[in-house]
Amino acid sequence: MKVSSSIKADPSKGDKLVRRKGRLYVINKKDPNRKQRQAGPARKK
């Protein structure tokens, strides 16, 4: 899964934008290698 500050979804390639637990994810059932997650704030220690 790629993690980047800004993610882009391409619906023509089967991408879907999903919000889970306050984070944005791109999921793709046709091509699972296209999974992405938007990087949020750093975790508190």
Swiss-Prot record:
Keyword Disulfide bond included in the entry's annotation:
no
**Record keywords:** Ribonucleoprotein, Ribosomal protein
Please provide the Gene Ontology terms (biological process) for this protein: translation
Chain intervals for the UniProt region annotation (Disordered): 1-45
Q: List the disulfide bonds.
A: none
Matching Pfam families, A to Z?
A: Ribosomal_L36
The molecular function terms of the Gene Ontology recorded here are: structural constituent of ribosome
- Please tell me one Gene Ontology term that the record gives under cellular component: ribonucleoprotein complex
Family (UniProt): Belongs to the bacterial ribosomal protein bL36 family.
The protein's name is Large ribosomal subunit protein bL36
